[in-house]
Amino acid sequence: MWSRRQGRLRPTVCGVEELRRRRREREAALRKARREQQLVSKRLLRNDAPEEAGEGCVAAILGETEVQQFLRQAQRGTEEKEREGALVSLRRGLQHPETQQTFIRLEGSMRTLVGLLTSNQALLQLEAARCLHELSHSEQSTVAEACLPATSYLLTYLSSHSSDFIELCLYTLGNLIVESEAVRRQLLPQGIVPALAACIQSPHVAVLEALGYALSQLLQAEEAPEKIIPSILASTLPQHMLQMLQPGPKLNPGVAVEFAWCLHYIICSQVSNPLLIGHGALSTLGLLLLDLAGAVQKTEDAGLELLACPVLRCLSNLLTEAAVETVGGQMQLRDERVVAALFILLQFFFQKQPSLLPEGLWLLNNLTANSPSFCTSLLSLDLIEPLLQLLPVSNVVSVMVLTVLCNVAEKGPAYCQRLWPGPLLPALLHTLAFSDTEVVGQSLELLHLLFLYQPEAVQVFLQQSGLQALERHQEEAQLQDRVYALQQTALQG
């Protein structure tokens, strides 16, 4: 959901509509990549006792006879400890894919396990749930679908009095959700959304983190925009998610990361982003951005990027919504502190996590695309030179930096006057030496704006061998029209 600024007029050979078409294609590819690069994963909770985890107690692969034996002992044993021990042995065997396949092939095995899950003995219940959890971690969808008879009970136990048991059920559901559409199809009418909405009011951090995980798995389903997200938006979950992201002493980083990704998936679906904006999503995320910038100034902890990444994406995507203006969304962020905070994060990423620079620049692009006030903040805070220092990082970063500068320049003569003179022209002459077509193309666009609004730039460009820099690209099909137009402008100027 990248909002690129509107292109400027070009020579008729490469008209505005053609440029828009190319840009739409690039944006579609970017949106697709961002949707596909999601955090689809599974999580495994194992709390083996020390004596179980020792080297001399490696879990063995179980055959049919052993699986049947452990199930029989767990179901009919005379002592509770014997029954519990049988389930522990079964659970440890289920860590192996071979045992998992053996288990689901055995007739009545899942029925027996579900029976133990619903027993009135808490320890047996817990061990049966742990067995299901091991099965849920399988990479085979057939194993997940074999667990279908247990899903309604897992949902019921989300209202249990034991926070540990609720946490286990949530992670198990999350693992099953991501593996099989059949599981999701069954869980929706069984009431998973109301069950999750009830869980979000839990006072236990571990439960909230597990809830965020299960919800994020549900939101990443291919059918989520049509079949899942509308019911989530109709529940109390969005308001509670935003509360979990409010900065302050109650903010828990682990919980915040989970719910920030949940919010990201909802926003990417574009089902009802005006609703989220109306709930104050922009102001909440903007305050969280300020909080993150303050945190990176106090700590060397690189783990902060786990939260920064989804927060930046959420803000960037929300700013592309038409509803931002109609509900006063821009006003929720109209503060130069947001720009200053973003640059603190960009410097942090530059030093510690360069792969996240595009996320921050993507937000800066969307802030400046249609907002003269944010462009003014960029200039008044003297942030052009720090921005130019990011150009050598990568071609992707270079394009985004140049796009932001184009956003500023296209606001007119007053803005170009403040961009000039300075390090901008030497930087542009340097980027014209790049071999990447998109970097050079964006450099040409910025030069075009400078020539248009700051005519004195033309003479300096000529004095610094600008024409020779242009000549190396005049045979490139994607660039030659723009190169020719700039050459003519420079010579006529």
UniProtKB/Swiss-Prot annotation:
Coiled-coil region(s): 15-84
Predominant location: membrane
InterPro entries linked: ARM-like, ARM-type_fold, Armadillo, Importin-a_IBB
Superkingdom of the organism of origin: Eukaryota
Keyword entries, A-Z: Coiled coil, Membrane, Transmembrane, Transmembrane helix
Membrane topology: Multi-pass membrane protein
Keyword Phosphoprotein included in the entry's annotation: no
Cellular localisation: Membrane
GO biological process terms held by the UniProt record: protein import into nucleus
Keyword Cytoplasm: no
GO cellular component, one term: membrane
Alphabetized GO MF terms: nuclear import signal receptor activity
Transmembrane segments: 338-358, 386-406
Cross-referenced PANTHER family: TRANSMEMBRANE AND COILED-COIL DOMAIN-CONTAINING PROTEIN 6, TRANSMEMBRANE AND COILED-COIL DOMAIN-CONTAINING PROTEIN 6 TMCO6
Protein name: Transmembrane and coiled-coil domain-containing protein 6
Gene encoding the protein: TMCO6
